[in-house]
Amino acid sequence: LLIPVILLWTRGDLKAYEGQIFETESSYNYIQVVRWGDCNYLLLNEGQAFHSFYCDGGRVDNISVWSIMLSAPYFSADPTIDNAAVIGLAAGTIPKQFTRVFGAIPIDGIELDPAIVQAGRDYFALTDPNINVIVGDGRYELNQLDGQYDVITIDAYKVPYIPWHLTTREFF
């Protein structure tokens, strides 16, 4: 009876995916980084979705949910942007793509989980000097920042839920 329990207890990674190069648990998430081809992907909790990706050299081959965010400035009469904010930074995919397309504009990125930020630095090249990483709750931290932004993206969720306090009228 104890043999199956011992085998399960000593089997290694909690939810190992093929190509897994990192895993940890934080106060907020179970975090995995997997490498497929020349790209790293961030998986959280049940692994139902990618929360960030980074390909060697910053290459972006495909249109993704993150690259769609790049269209935001074009909903304005003047599509030039001088700065941006990202609520739900994760490992930095959105600000890295904004930097690649619009140049090294100042970007404030807010992420609740410091372990995800560290994974971003270690596995997703989240080291750009124009990206100001802020660890904290998106609603609170955005209210603490001084100034206005040309673009604010919100990509804070735990699949499949959006944090309720980021959906209130007070937030917007």
Show the residue positions of the predicted features.
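Basic, ligand-binding patches in group-transfer machinery
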Residues: 2-47
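Short linear motifs at secondary-structure transitions and domain/linker junctions
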Residues: 5-10, 16-20, 59-62, 83-85, ...
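Soluble or luminal CAZymes and related metallo-dependent hydrolases
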Residues: 25, 61-65, 167
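A broad, structure-centric signal for solvent-exposed, well-ordered loop/edge residues
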Residues: 40, 49-51, 133, 141
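Short Gly/aromatic-enriched secondary-structure transition segments
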Residues: 44-49, 56-59
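A short, flexible beta-alpha/helix-coil linker loop
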Residues: 47-52, 157-160
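Conserved SAM-binding loop and adjacent beta-strand
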Residues: 54-69
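The AdoMet/dcAdoMet-binding core of the Class I SAM-like
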Residues: 67-172
